[in-house]
Amino acid sequence: FDNKEFEHDIYELIRAFYPEAEIAVSYEEEDGANTADLLFRVEKQEQSFIIRYQNESNTGVTSAEIIKGHSSDDAPLSCTEEKGAARQQRKEQKDVLKYSLYKLLTKLTGKTLPWGNLTGIRPAKLAMAMIEAGMKNSEIAEEMRKRYLVSPEKTALAITIANREREILKDIDYENGYSLYAVS
């Protein structure tokens, strides 16, 4: 890596494709004496990421470009709006990087993962956020399959769980906190 911004997400995604491998993270330029079987280097360059990989038989490069949305309103943003915009931009960057890395890892290994490139988040939580944003189940399914590369089976499971959670929570003021205990 050339920075630590998305280290955990990238590490977990590589670990999912190579569960038996010993994975090391480095922020130093390698001197060519690296003994790793497979080497990835992620570099951020303005609005894009460059992912370089090298193994015994193959060397290549792929890139992930972040396309910034443009606002027709040139009014200055408030501090809160700036923080929200920065948080949204960071999420978009992470999503694009993980998508591109997942596609590369799929190409290198021939494997796919049922939960796609989702690491570090409960898929049902993601589906719940989309439900609360007013999306239909079919729109959520399409978003999860296209953006996060989740399998149709796992997409259906996440949406089912999110709808059940929403039904359970509909009469609870969960935005101000709640406790839920499962007793068997």
Outline where the language-model segments fall.
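A short, structured N-terminal alpha-helical element that caps or precedes a catalytic domain
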Residues: 1-107, 111-114
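Glycine-centered flexibility motif
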Residues: 1-4, 116, 120, 134, ...
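Short, charge-rich amphipathic segments
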Residues: 4-12, 45-47, 79, 136-151, ...
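A short N-terminal interaction module
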Residues: 92-159
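N-terminal pre-triad scaffold of radical SAM enzymes
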Residues: 121-128, 164-184
